[in-house]
């Protein structure tokens, strides 16, 4: 059978349909991971296997209605995303289709099949300012910043020469207003001229090149005391939040998006509930951050990739790659980006389903054998880097992946594969959540491997903090050991020192680690407040121990200390109610 060409594109024919997986013959010359258009409605698909002239395609849209013999169009390019002004503050689906634009055009609640809308608005006018250090005749190489566009009040969008390009500037647009279709740069390389607009495309599976990877040494401040004080991450780190249903993974992810010290947020809802994305869309525009002397909505530094659980399964993989590629683009501008993937378990389930339809050999719990490799290739795109091109700049991507192990079982293949890759583990505990202790991060099983990297930062700014942190961990661990004895013989039979340990551990648990996300004073805790709260609690612990040991024949007891220092203890416990907006002198 001969291969047909339609509009210069090669045309294959469907020979088998199995859910989101389609087999097509006559696909000679097609490439792995090439983007194809399937059926008469031109559904978006991607080639994931080639055998002779037969290609196996995963389709990113609902495949009902496809029939044997329908055409398959090869586009000749891989699945790519559009990168340019207009990304921030927008909401896309897993294959970067703008949901608001689709809603306007279709007047439908759901995305119509085969809809083809450009990711970025071609008609919108942007204010372009050329770089001061470049002029016609200057050489320009990959990654060089040749213009700036004020994308939002929070982000100046730097227009960079795409990777793999270089030459001499023939034309550089003067300051003014341009659309994404207008030429703003023309270069000449060996007699060949190329024109560039403010937008370019990049394949999602290919990491964007960098000059070098750097050691991360600045903390990612989340505003959550338990994370910042006990298990900190760095800007450019990898974190996992595994937890059973109802433990608060999404709330922690959203809190990081709202309050962390990142320049930009990419929030990928990968196979999660639709109402959670609706909550994000409702909450984020109302939340503000102070920039100079004005308040700005945090939506202006946030990009949402919504891929809810009722959307096609295959698109979950695309949504993860779309999110990380856009994050890399903003990182290349010299920004610190946080990417939330909620949840990677849903992506793994999609891999399992497609792997099953391809009749691949299943590994643990039916997941494919390459699950760990796929997770690693995703998490390894995080990190702090020295960006390509001039001027010299550094950027970072922090990946926070939520994991939903069935029944909260951390030996689940997705969780164990993730823990082998990430450096920070914020383990959520169902029992803490049932006790209404939020964030329900279990302080006995969680860990951070970035403490060594962050020591110079703490030594310079909060010299005593590391001692307080170590002491707090010891108190919480000792409390866990003592609880077994207490359950057997009761509190009264313990030594006074142990009673003090239990009292201070309770104080740390209830008044320091627990945090109310729904109050003005406690939804965000600046790091200095965390340090001062911890300092006061540890000082009380040390002074109480000295009073008990040094009381001689009088035998000063915890009960007497509580009686004499009741007001002080009450003040220490009530520090969380103090609003940080009133200044640090309160503490």
UniProtKB/Swiss-Prot annotation:
EC numbers on record: 7.1.2.2
Q: What Gene Ontology cellular-component terms does the record carry?
A: proton-transporting V-type ATPase, V1 domain
Catalytic activity, as annotated: ATP + H2O + 4 H(+)(in) = ADP + phosphate + 5 H(+)(out)
Would I find Repressor among this entry's keywords? no
Which of UniProt's keywords are assigned here? ATP-binding, Hydrogen ion transport, Ion transport, Nucleotide-binding, Translocase, Transport
Group of enzyme by EC: translocase
NCBIfam families, per database record: PRK04192.1 (NF003220), V-ATPase_V1_A (TIGR01042)
Q: Quaternary structure per UniProt? A: V-ATPase is a heteromultimeric enzyme composed of a peripheral catalytic V1 complex (main components: subunits A, B, C, D, E, and F) attached to an integral membrane V0 proton pore complex (main component: the proteolipid protein).
Name under which the protein is recorded: V-type proton ATPase catalytic subunit A
